[in-house]
Amino acid sequence: MQALLCALAGLALLRAGTGEWGQGPRDTPGRRAAESPSSPGDLAGSPGCDRHAAVQRRLDIMEETVEKTVEHLEAEVTGLLGLLEELASNLPTGPFSPKPDLLGDDGF
């Protein structure tokens, strides 16, 4: 999929440079054929493809960082809830010390 996107980005850059999508004059077929790459592998080095690949790498790194952060926060919240439940269960019950509702289920 990435190779296809790079190829499309390269074609878009080639067409924009030769006036296909821009406002410049259209080139003759012979000149356009001479300027176009001879194989699809040549498109992999185009600036648009390089930029796309760099952005994709940065997005992958950001996604991995977010996933690790979420996993860490889930573990922290689970640990804190466990501590709160343990504290709530260890409080003495009696007429002057009602069991507090630490999780907020009092129907406020």
Swiss-Prot record:
This is Placenta-specific protein 9. GO terms for cellular component: extracellular region. The lineage of its organism: Eukaryota, Metazoa, Chordata, Craniata, Vertebrata. The gene is Plac9. Belongs to the PLAC9 family. Residues 1-19 form the signal peptide. Its main location: secreted. Highly expressed in placenta, and weakly in ovary, testis, and lung. It is found in: Secreted.
